[in-house]
Amino acid sequence: MSETAPLAPTIPAPAEKTPVKKKAKKAGATAGKRKASGPPVSELITKAVAASKERSGVSLAALKKALAAAGYDVEKNNSRIKLGLKSLVSKGTLVQTKGTGASGSFKLNKKAASGEGKPKAKKAGAAKPRKPAGAAKKPKKVAGAATPKKSIKKTPKKVKKPATAAGTKKVAKSAKKVKTPQPKKAAKSPAKAKAPKPKAAKPKSGKPKVTKAKKAAPKKK
C-alpha cells in the first residue's frame, strides 16, 4: 500500500503545464490579428476631419463619433486617438483652432494639403526635361561631325611632304643650270678673238711677189 500512494500525484502534473502554453499562443495570435486589422488611427482622423464641413473645425467628441461610425473602438483606443491628434498637429497636417492639447477643435491644414499636390505637379514637370535628354543626343552627332576634322588634318600633312621634296629638287636643278652655262660662254668668246689675227698676216706674204718682177728688167741688153 505504501508503494501505490506516491504514484497518483505524479500523473496529473504534466497535464497542467500543457494547457498554459496553448492559451499563451492563442492570446498572442489574437493580439497580432487585432494589430493587423484596419488602418492606423492617424489616417482615420484625417479622413474624419476632411469629411466634416464645419468651418470652426471638428471637436474631439465629433471625431470620436465619426470614428465609432467607421467601426473603430473609441473607448479602448482613447489614448491612441489623443496621441494621433498631437502627432498630426506637430507634423502640420492638422491645425488646432480651439483648446489646447487633444481637447479642442481641429481642421485640415490647407498649406499641407496643397503641398501634397505640388509634388505631383513637380513630377509632371520632371517629365518635360526628358526632351532635353533627346537634345543631348544631338551633340553626339556634332561630335561625330568632328571626325572629318581629323581627316582634314591628315590630308595637308600628305600634301606638305611632297611639296617640300619637289621644292628642294627644283631649287637644286635650277642652281646647277645657272652655274654651268657661265663658264662655257666665257671660253667661246676668247677663241673667236684669237681667230682673226692670223687672217691679217696674209697681206705680208704678197709683198715678195712684187720684188720678183723687178729682177726681170735686165733682158734689154
Swiss-Prot record:
Residues 37-110 form the H15 domain. The modification Citrulline is found at R55. Residues 20-36, 120-141, 150-161, 170-179, 194-221 have a biased composition (Basic residues). The C-terminal domain is required for high-affinity binding to chromatin. One of its GO terms (molecular function) is RNA binding. It comes from Homo sapiens (Human). The gene is H1-3. Histone H1 protein binds to linker DNA between nucleosomes forming the macromolecular structure known as the chromatin fiber. Histones H1 are necessary for the condensation of nucleosome chains into higher-order structured fibers. Also acts as a regulator of individual gene transcription through chromatin remodeling, nucleosome spacing and DNA methylation. Coiled coil: none annotated. Residues 1-17, 180-193 have a biased composition (Low complexity). H1 histones are progressively phosphorylated during the cell cycle, becoming maximally phosphorylated during late G2 phase and M phase, and being dephosphorylated sharply thereafter. InterPro entries: H1/H5, Histone_H1/H5_H15, WH-like_DNA-bd_sf, WH_DNA-bd_sf. The lineage of its organism: Eukaryota, Metazoa, Chordata, Craniata, Vertebrata. This is Histone H1.3. Keywords: Acetylation, Chromosome, Citrullination, DNA-binding, Hydroxylation, Nucleus, Phosphoprotein. Belongs to the histone H1/H5 family.
